[in-house]
Amino acid sequence: MTNLAVKYKQQAQEEVQIQTPPQQMAKPKVKAKITRIEKLLYVAFIGFLLYACVAFIGNKAGLYQVNVEAATIEEKIVQQQKENQELQAEVEKLSRYERIAEVAKKHGLEINANNVKGLK
């Protein structure tokens, strides 16, 4: 072949190469490997989160129980104060002078103003 024929073949090959887009080689996907330390850290973090959740829920349950007990005690205090007021009113009613004089007459006693002592 002559030099001209070789040049023609080379030119034809270059045109074919120019016309066809170059094929890119597929790059293999590289898996990101998780190291043992990273796995340990992930497990520790998840464990800590679980512990924190359980502790939080436990504390909430404990606070609820304490609030229920406090409400019960407050209710008992209010009830006792009401009972104390009723008893104080009864004491005042029973310690009136007219009632004491009536009981004294019933038992045959006389009230002597010189001999009366105040207890209050």
UniProtKB/Swiss-Prot annotation:
It is found in: Cell membrane. Residues 1-36 are cytoplasmic. GO terms for cellular component: cell division site; plasma membrane. Its main location: membrane. Keywords: Cell cycle, Cell division, Cell membrane, Membrane, Transmembrane, Transmembrane helix. The keyword Cell membrane applies. It is a single-pass type II membrane protein. Residues 58-120 are extracellular. Coiled coil: none annotated. It holds the Pfam family DivIC. Belongs to the FtsL family. Essential cell division protein. This is Cell division protein FtsL.
